[in-house]
Amino acid sequence: MLKNIQCKIKEGYLIFSWKPFRKFRIPTKVKGKLMQVRFVPKSGYYTMEIVYQINAPEITIESKNIVGIDIGIDNFATISNNIGTTPIIINGRIVKSFNQYYNKKKAELQADLKVRHKMDWSKRLQRLTDKRNNKISNFLHNASKTIIDWCVFYGIDTIIIGKNDNWKQESKMSKKVNQNFIQIPHALFIDKLKYKAENKGIKVICTEESYTSGTSFLDSELPIKENYNKGRRIKRGLFKSNTGKLINADLNGAYQIIKKVFPNVFTNGIEGAGSHPIRLNII
């Protein structure tokens, strides 16, 4: 670890006064006050982390413009709101494809290793794992940045995230379970959302999401046990209200997540709430 007396940022470059590193000039977009530079060991290499301090805006106390986020797999993040603008869905199928390819390739390589060398792991497997992890990390960064940029554009002051300790796994157990049973670091995604939101003065609230998937937003139901009926969630990811209206099932859950924390936020009616989300593909 190098303290800020051993390095500095000047004209868009990280410069080192520490003798072994003096020849290096590393371009950076860091704008805040440099605190330290640390080198974190990984599998066969190191990553450099720049720790810096910025003056974050004060987080608002009152919640007026609110979004709710339902986290899943195919629909990685479904974002509802109470301001009447079109909701959005972050497509998660690309992450699913990362894991399917990784699980398949990993199984093939491990099978070959066991037969040929009586081994379970190799440098090639480590490279495959690192590549998968880097792709997912990049996706989480871009997805969280997209959401925060959207919130800033629409003047959102509060984000409510539905949290489930077991996280939904939509894949069905079958002979392809190793390709389809997906492990996505949702907690890391929430952490990225939190610090990006904090830097913009946006409040983040995590709430448990019980009864949000089986209660009806379109029928103005509260997400409580007495209203729970998951039988209204029909095929193709749709939720059917008591009056026969259809809404994206995850979007219904995202609206109900808002009502978990602010049950009266839609007291002026739900007519202005969007029921047809836009799907975004994050690269």
Question: What kind of feature is each model-predicted range?
Answer:
Residues K31-V51, S220:
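An anion-binding catalytic pocket shared by soluble metabolic enzymes
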Residues I5-C7, E11-S17, N75-N82, R236-N242:
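Short polybasic amphipathic segments
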Residues L2, G32-L34, S43, K64-I66, ...:
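Short beta-strand-initiation
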Residues F21, Q53-N55, D74, G84, ...:
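Short, glycine-/Ser/Thr-/acidic-enriched flexible segments
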Residues S17-G32, T60-E62, T85-R93, I247-L251:
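Short amphipathic beta-strand/extended segments with alternating polar/hydrophobic composition
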Residues M1-V40, Q183:
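Acidic carboxylate diad motif detector
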Residues K42-I190, T267-I283:
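Substrate-contacting helices/loops that form the catalytic groove of nucleic-acid
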